[in-house]
């Protein structure tokens, strides 16, 4: 019997395509300081296909899936994170100019990784409170279908 997994040790990583339209499998860098990853499990829309021959129940088929917009990663806003995000943004800009995408990996110990192509947004100011850790939200807009696959090397 398999044991349930803990979220301890999950890493958010990124890499750009070396070949356009091909998910990278190596060369991923870790984004330090990530505290929280939101749900990314979009439900499909439902399309009604009921016709006049149906006498009691409506019928539906699955439509498109919508991730609902940008994915917000809650992060500790410190120098190492800012350096990582700057590197990610610069790599994205360079790759984008060459027709290539940035890929995000959620590396989960004990199972396959979750990957998706994304467009990052520039950081703003995440706010502040008395006696609290300085945090921010780093936004990644999904730009393609996610996939479960073997963890990157």
Can you name each region flagged by the protein language model?
Residues 1-7, 148-153:
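Compositionally biased, intrinsically disordered low-complexity segments enriched in polar/Pro/Gly
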Residues 2-77, 119-134:
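Solvent-exposed edge beta-strands and adjacent loop segments
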Residues 17-21, 111, 150-152:
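Polar, enzyme-active/binding microenvironments
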Residues 24-25, 84-85, 151:
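A short, polar/proline- and glycine-enriched secondary-structure boundary/capping micro-motif
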Residues 77-81, 145:
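Acidic glycine-/aspartate-rich tracts in secreted/extracellular proteins
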Residues 82-117, 121:
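Short, acidic/charged, Gly/Pro-enriched secondary-structure junctions
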Residues 87-92, 135-137, 152-153:
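Short intrinsically disordered coil segments
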Residues 105-148:
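Short beta-strand and beta-hairpin "edge-sheet" elements
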């Amino acid at each position: 019997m398999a044991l349930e997994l803990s979220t301890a040790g999950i890493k958010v990583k990124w890499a750009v395509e070396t070949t356009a339209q091909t998910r990278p499998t190596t060369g991923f860098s870790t984004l330090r300081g990530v505290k929280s990853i939101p749900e990314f499990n979009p439900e499909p829309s439902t399309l009604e296909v009921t016709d006049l021959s149906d006498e009691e129940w409506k019928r539906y088929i699955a439509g498109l899936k919508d991730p609902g917009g940008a994915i917000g990663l809650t992060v500790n806003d410190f120098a190492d994170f800012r350096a990582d995000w700057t590197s990610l943004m610069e790599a994205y800009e360079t790759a984008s100019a060459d027709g290539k995408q940035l890929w995000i990996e959620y590396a989960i110990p004990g199972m396959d990784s979750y990957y998706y192509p994304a467009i990052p947004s520039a950081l703003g100011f995440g706010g502040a409170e008395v006696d609290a850790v300085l945090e921010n939200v780093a936004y990644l807009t999904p730009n393609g279908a996610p996939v479960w696959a073997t963890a990157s090397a």
